[in-house]
A protein has these predicted regions:
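Structured C-terminal helix/loop/strand segments within mature extracytoplasmic catalytic/sensor domains
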Residues: 26-59, 259-434
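Beta-lactamase-like hydrolase cores
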Residues: 30-101
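Acidic helix-start/capping segments at beta-turn-to-alpha-helix junctions
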Residues: 76-81, 128-149, 183-184, 205-213, ...
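Short glycine/serine- and small hydrophobic-enriched flexible loop segments
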Residues: 115-123, 169, 173, 280-287, ...
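Active-site SXXK
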Residues: 103-129, 135, 378
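Bacterial Sec-dependent N-terminal signal peptides
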Residues: 1-38
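Active-site-adjacent helix/loop patches that line small-molecule binding or acyl-intermediate pockets
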Residues: 39-58, 70, 139-140, 144, ...
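Extracytoplasmic
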Residues: 70-72, 90-92, 98-100, 104-109, ...
């Protein structure tokens, strides 16, 4: 019977959000909702007309917006205004956002995982552990692999800091997997749900295909000091909690090897997190005092600023790990598209995490123009799979996805540059020495 009690508890938690999503579908009006600690959903209806009208001014965006459901487009734009004391207030605008509509989050799940890893490391401070402590990943099952060194760190020692930098600089899948293994499913998902993101289900590694049972198991890990002394021996972990009973499917066919299976592909046991959750997780890092205490990540200010700096760094600016051959802005798709569209805009920093897989392209971003004192948040997802077939490596990223993202980011940026503010923001806290 415990499993039924658990499932009933999750149904009661998620049902209000699903009802609000259905209302949003029927009315065409977006809903800004927040799940409170007691499980109640507080909703505020906001107007979609402003954001949609603004985006429809753009001749490149308009035809895509006309097919918003075909492209599964969702957009969240947050206007930020400061008072005389430089304290921010936020106005959220939504286009076609519905928490009940599934999209594959791809590499955007790496952002909350990286943040939770920093939080977990901070909780181990009394044991002498921090983000730069040597982290040796072992293996205890046939599906697990070990890590004893990292040639991309200055001293060859693997550590969380290096993994997190790889995640934000080049979206390294193995780096995410090592963070996932450090956290374990229970800590990762339980921590995010406790902070107000109840639909979150990050339940598998990336790039490598493993059975569900193997993804429930996470590797044993040892932390060592500079002299090789053992600080912590974290054993293999196994998540026994049942997964959500989901019915998420996509496409009208998928490839299994060289064979086309003419039916939708089941995503019920793949990662899930909503766009608004990703948007609010980023806000909690950039503006921790703007969210409720229970929604904040328990990071030292030094770790938080280090994380923000890492999010805003271009791959070519990195010394460790070095990425000399990367496109300068290839990790900033909401303004630069595929990163091949020319030089970067001086003074503009974008603190973000991108993702792309199964035809979905995503970016979750905070923009700070340090030259023109302009800031805003923008998150978006688009589905680029015109033939509806998954796993065929024939996606429309370069013809639909990247152009849409680039144009969307520039449209909002141009609007923000021209928008009059009562108080210009002081963005000096984002002037890092990259």
């Amino acid at each position: 019977m415990p499993i039924f009690k658990y499932l009933w508890g999750m149904i009661k938690l998620l049902l209000p959000a699903l009802i609000l999503g259905l209302i949003s579908c029927r009315t065409g009006r977006p809903l800004n909702y927040q799940v409170e600690p007691n499980g109640k959903v507080k909703a505020e209806t906001t107007t979609m007309s402003f954001l949609e009208q603004l985006l429809r001014e753009d001749s490149l965006l308009r035809p895509m917006l006309d097919k918003k459901d075909e492209y599964k487009i969702q957009v969240i734009y947050t206007r930020i205004d400061r008072n005389a004391a430089n304290e921010p207030t936020f106005s959220d605008f939504f286009f076609n956002v519905n928490p009940a509509h599934y999209f594959y989050p791809a590499s955007t799940v790496k952002m909350p995982a990286a943040i939770m890893a920093l939080e977990k490391a901070a909780s181990l401070k009394e044991q002498g552990i921090n983000k730069e402590t040597t982290m040796i990943t072992g293996s205890a099952t046939p599906g697990q692999t070990s890590v004893y060194n990292d040639p991309l760190t200055p001293d060859g020692r693997p550590n969380l800091a290096s993994y997190i930098r790889k995640i934000f600089l080049v979206s390294d899948n193995d780096a995410f997997n090592r963070v996932y293994e450090f956290l374990g499913q229970s800590y990762l998902n339980g921590g995010l749900r406790a902070k107000g993101y109840p639909e979150t289900e990050i339940i598998h590694r990336l790039q490598i295909s493993l059975p569900e049972e193997e993804n429930r198991r996470t590797n044993p890990i040892r932390f060592l000091d500079r002299q090789g002394k053992l600080l912590l021996d974290q054993p293999l972990a196994y998540n026994e909690a049942p997964y959500f009973q989901r019915r998420d499917s996509l496409g009208n066919g998928f490839m299994r090897g060289n064979t086309l299976v003419p039916q939708s592909m089941d995503f019920s046991h793949k990662n899930r997190i909503g766009l608004q959750s990703l948007h609010n997780i980023l806000r909690a890092v950039i503006f921790p005092m703007a969210v409720k205490p229970e929604q904040r990540f328990q990071l030292s200010e030094a770790d938080r600023l280090w994380l923000v700096k890492t999010m805003g760094e271009f791959p070519t600016e990195s010394r460790f790990p070095p990425y000399p051959g990367q496109d300068t802005a290839g990790n900033k798709i909401l303004f630069y598209g595929d990163g091949k569209s020319g030089p970067v805009t001086p003074g503009l920093r974008i603190f973000n995490k991108t993702g792309g897989a199964y035809g979905f392209l995503l970016d979750v971003a905070y923009f700070a123009d340090l030259t023109n004192n302009t800031e805003f948040m923008l998150s978006a997802v688009i589905y680029c799979n015109s033939d509806g077939v998954l796993n065929d490596d024939k996606y429309d990223y370069h013809t639909i996805g990247y152009p849409f993202m680039r144009e969307l980011g520039r449209k909002i940026y141009d609007y923000e540059r021209s928008r009059k503010r009562e108080h210009a923001p002081d963005l000096s806290e984002f002037r890092f020495n990259w």
